[in-house]
A protein has these predicted regions:
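Surface-exposed, interaction-prone regions used to assemble/regulate multi-protein complexes
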Residues: 1-126
Length: 126
């Protein structure tokens, strides 16, 4: 498994995450900086295929067995929005889904979230 920091426009800090998922599977994640109340962002994933919440830490991401043996663990300071490459989760879904998909992970201070989607997320400062 590899990862790439793609949320460069999101200034690094400690963000609390809030999620809004519609009945049509449209996912928006709102980030609010716990120290600097002026830093607020929305990551709009559009219609997603799958999402799951990760509670406090990579060791609880059970579908990514190779995380524990890999040389490099992404930390909160490595990026808030990451594109995950060659993951077990993405590979399992891709076997049954004909279109190309992307695996993203958003890391917050209260939890993290895995997202599978066909689209690139849109980041808005609010």
């Amino acid at each position: 498994m590899k990862w790439v920091h793609i949320g460069e426009e999101i200034k690094y800090d400690w963000y609390e995450l809030r999620c809004q998922l519609s009945q049509e599977n449209h996912l928006q994640i709102f980030l609010e900086d716990l120290k600097n109340q002026n830093l607020k962002y929305c990551i709009d994933f559009g219609k997603i295929l799958f999402c799951r919440f990760i509670d406090e830490g990579w060791d609880l991401n059970l579908l990514e067995e190779d995380l524990l043996s890999g040389p490099e663990f992404p930390n909160l300071s490595d990026g808030i929005l990451l594109e995950m490459k060659d993951t077990h989760l993405k590979n399992r879904v891709q076997k049954f889904y004909p279109a190309p998909i992307y695996h993203y992970q958003v890391q917050g201070i209260n939890f993290g979230i895995d997202v599978l989607t066909e689209a690139f997320p849109i980041i808005k400062k609010i």
